[in-house]
Structure formats: C-alpha cells, structure tokens
Amino acid sequence: MRVLKYAILGLLRKGELSGYDITSYFKEELGQFWSAKHSQIYPELKKLTDEGFITFRTTIQGTKLEKKMYTLTDSGKQELHDWLIRHQPIPETVKDEFMLKAYFISCLSRQEASDLFKDQLQKRQAKLSDLQGSYEKLMASAEPMSFSSPDFGHYLVLTKALEREKNYVSWLESILAMIDKD
C-alpha cells in the first residue's frame, strides 16, 4: 500500500500546495509521526497526477522559476475518504535501533550502558521540549480545540507524540536508575 499517497491527498484536502509546501509539512507537523523525503514526494505527485487524483497548474516565480501548485480532484477526495474509513490491522513492530541495542545491553560495561541511556535520554528530552513548543504554539493560535476545529487532527497526533515521549523519558530515567544502582 502506498501510504505516502494518502498523506499527500490529505494535505491537499487543506488546499492548493506546491511540492515544496508538501515537503515542509513532512518536516514539521507530519514529521511527528511520518517521514517522507523530497525524493519520494515528487515521484508520488507524478503518480497521483497520472491517476487523476490531483491536478496542477504551473506558475512562474521571478523571471524563470516554474512552480507547480497541486490541488485535489473529486476522485482524489473520494480515494482519501475510502482510505480513511477502511479499518487497518495493527502495524508490525516499528524498527528501533536503540531498543535493539538495549536488548543486547549485557554486552556492555555498566559505564557504557549508562552512557548509552544518558545519550538517549538527552535526545528524547530535547524532542519532548520541541513537541511541547509545538503544542503551545498550536494551542495559542487555535480556537478552543474540538472535533470541528480545523487543527483537530494535528492536535490528536501532537498529543499522542507528547505522551509517547513523556513515557519514553520516564522509562529511560527508571532504567538509568537501575543501571547506576550499586
């Protein structure tokens, strides 16, 4: 299944966007739970155009730079809707290199294990701080949050990401206490 297809269709549901705009969403809001690179996005835009799910118009920026502005077609809206209402199985386990290292922690000295977990804790705390900043920005710019709010979907994934990182930080702290004990 081409999930990137649905991510792009969903973004275009908000309105007309350029490929650059779509890439920016993957670096910001969508980046909290989904990733896609420039090299993946543009071929997918071509496929979606060929399938009739999106169209584009070309604009000129400056004197020469052509910019494609993409919009969702009615069949693209229907394709997105059909995907949204389709129930999905729970995905396979996400690959997490740090957790693989944790599994083999007995190969490390106590100090090496502590250093590994401290490094991960620092990175997760920084990520949590970034997410908290995004949350504060969202809540300051939004009307009271409800199902009918235009940013409700962003609120959902952001609060889930916050909870995930809070739990990860808490878990790392408890494991560090165990490692450093004795």
UniProtKB/Swiss-Prot annotation:
Outcome recorded upon mutating T63A: Retains the repressor function, but shows a reduced capacity to bind to the padC promoter. PAD activity in induced cultures is increased 2-fold compared to wild-type strain
Activity regulation, short description: PadR repressor activity is inhibited in the presence of phenolic acids, which directly modulate PadR binding to the promoter of padC, leading to the dissociation of PadR from the operator DNA and expression of padC. In the presence of MgCl(2), binding is not altered by phenolic acids.
Listed InterPro entries: Tscrpt_reg_PadR_C, Tscrpt_reg_PadR_N, WH-like_DNA-bd_sf, WH_DNA-bd_sf
Record keywords, A-Z: Cytoplasm, DNA-binding, Repressor, Transcription, Transcription regulation
Result of changing L138P: Retains the repressor function but is not completely inactivated by ferulic acid. Displays a higher affinity for the padC promoter
Site (described: Important for activity. Contributes to protein stability and DNA binding): Y70
Cellular compartment(s): Cytoplasm
Keyword Zinc-finger part of the UniProt annotation: no
Pfam families to which the protein is assigned, alphabetical: PadR (PF03551), Vir_act_alpha_C (PF10400)
Keyword presence, DNA-binding: yes
Induction (record text): Expression is low and appears constitutive.
CC annotations in GO: cytoplasm
Effect of I85T: Lack of repressor function
Molecular function in Gene Ontology: DNA binding
Main location: cytoplasm
Effect of disrupting the coding gene: Deletion of the gene results in constitutive expression of padC and constitutive phenolic acid decarboxylase activity.
Biological role stated in the UniProt entry: Transcriptional regulator involved in the regulation of the metabolism of phenolic acids. In the absence of phenolic acids, represses the expression of padC, which encodes a phenolic acid decarboxylase (PAD) involved in the detoxification of harmful phenolic acids. Acts by binding to the padC promoter region, preventing the transcription of the gene.
Assembly and binders: Homodimer.
Family: Belongs to the PadR family.
PANTHER family cross-referenced by the UniProt entry: NEGATIVE TRANSCRIPTION REGULATOR PADR (PTHR43252:SF6), TRANSCRIPTIONAL REGULATOR YQJI (PTHR43252)
Notes on the domains: Contains an N-terminal domain (NTD), which harbors a winged helix-turn-helix (wHTH) motif that is used for DNA binding, and a C-terminal dimerization domain (CTD).
Name of the protein in question: Negative transcriptional regulator PadR
Organism expressing this protein natively: Bacillus subtilis (strain 168)
Name of the coding gene: padR
